Amino acid sequence: MLPPMALPSVSWMLLSCLMLLSQVQGEEPQRELPSARIRCPKGSKAYGSHCYALFLSPKSWTDADLACQKRPSGNLVSVLSGAEGSFVSSLVKSIGNSYSYVWIGLHDPTQGTEPNGEGWEWSSSDVMNYFAWERNPSTISSPGHCASLSRSTAFLRWKDYNCNVRLPYVCKFTD
């Protein structure tokens, strides 16, 4: 039998081992974010702790990101998981539009100078741990340096695109 003082430390050690084991086995942490407990402005939808809105008035990538930054903690959407990607896809598809591409917050400020496409980053500065490229831009002879969601992939996959083209866009923000 363990002395009373050892019980909390053993419990903590067991919990730490279980958490480490789930990471080592490659088990994805929670697939779906908890249901939203935030209120979002009209025309936007909640997912996790953020609001998301699709804007159909086309803008260049830079102008779209600047428009998103006018909202609290806003940027063009960063897609950080497959579950979030599915949510954004359903948001874009729920509002009928004739566009083939929609801006997201991924861009390559190095304009392809980093090897193997490593210059890509989210405008929100979120860490890139999830990738959903339609085709890896480092394998394309003349890639664009901004990313869009592509209708041909049901708005689930990313495609590099010319940053100056005017497209609809998705903002992610808090409210």
Curated annotation (Swiss-Prot):
Zn(2+) binds at H50, H107, E121, H145. Proteolytic processing by trypsin removes an inhibitory N-terminal propeptide and is essential for peptidoglycan binding and antibacterial activity. Residues 47-172 form the C-type lectin domain. Acts as a hormone in response to different stimuli like anti-inflammatory signals, such as IL17A, or gut microbiome. Secreted by different cell types to activate its receptor EXTL3 and induce cell specific signaling pathways. Induced by IL17A in keratinocytes, regulates keratinocyte proliferation and differentiation after skin injury via activation of EXTL3-PI3K-AKT signaling pathway. In parallel, inhibits skin inflammation through the inhibition of inflammatory cytokines such as IL6 and TNF. In pancreas, is able to permealize beta-cells membrane and stimulate their proliferation. One of its GO terms (molecular function) is carbohydrate binding. Gene3D superfamilies: Mannose-Binding Protein A, subunit A (3.10.100.10). Induction: Appears in pancreatic juice after induction of pancreatic inflammation. Induced by IL17A and IL33 during skin inflammation. This is Regenerating islet-derived protein 3-alpha. Its main location: secreted. Residues 27-37 form a propeptide. InterPro entries: C-type_lectin-like, C-type_lectin-like/link_sf, C-type_lectin/snaclec_domain, C-type_lectin_CS, CTDL_fold. Changing E114Q: Reduces peptidoglycan binding and antibacterial activity. No effect on binding to phospholipids and membrane toxicity. No effect on filament formation. Keywords: Acute phase, Antimicrobial, Disulfide bond, Inflammatory response, Lectin, Secreted, Signal. One of its GO terms (biological process) is heterophilic cell-cell adhesion via plasma membrane cell adhesion molecules. A motif (EPN) lies at residues 114-116. Residues 1-26 form the signal peptide. GO terms for cellular component: cytoplasm; extracellular region; extracellular space. The gene is REG3A. SMART domains: CLECT. Residues 103-118 are annotated as: Sufficient to activate EXTL3. Expressed by keratinocytes. Highly expressed in epidermal keratinocytes of psoriasis patients (at protein level). Constitutively expressed in intestine. Low expression is found in healthy pancreas. Overexpressed during the acute phase of pancreatitis and in some patients with chronic pancreatitis. Disulfide bonds join C40-C51, C68-C171, C146-C163. It is found in: Secreted. Changing K93A: Reduces binding to phospholipids and membrane toxicity. Loss of filament formation.
